[in-house]
Amino acid sequence: MILLLLACSGTGATDSKGGTSPTLSSVQSEVFNASCAFSTCHAAPGASGLVLEDGSAWSALVTVESADNPGAILVIPGDANGSYLVQKLRGDAGIVGDEMPAGNPLDAERIQLVVDWIDAGAADD
């Protein structure tokens, strides 16, 4: 599902520490498009109904309950550790099914990109 580098310069807003906060655009291009939004995975109609294509990911993730794990919210703005998406990407204990992306887990840098975006508020840019 998720791969590649951290956000390139100019792809995020300045955070309170003077660093760059990832944007949905950077997460979309570096994670979702690169590792998730394929015809066999999360392109329309999407595995488990989850579509992570351009223009669909934010509304499919933010404050949305998991279809596979009722009660688990996919993305909780400001709370990456509590977000089921991050738990699935990390392969945390208690997830339903497999770590994502199946068979090709993301590297730590790409997971951190998603974590940073969520912790920064998971804005739709």
Stretches found by the model and what they are:
Residues 5-7:
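C-terminal motif of bacterial Sec signal peptides marking the signal peptidase cleavage site
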Residues 108, 112, 120-125:
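Flexible coil segments in periplasmic/lumen-exposed cytochrome c-class electron-transfer proteins
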Residues 10-21, 25-112:
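Solvent-exposed helix-loop boundary motif
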Residues 1-3, 36:
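Sec-dependent signal peptide hydrophobic core
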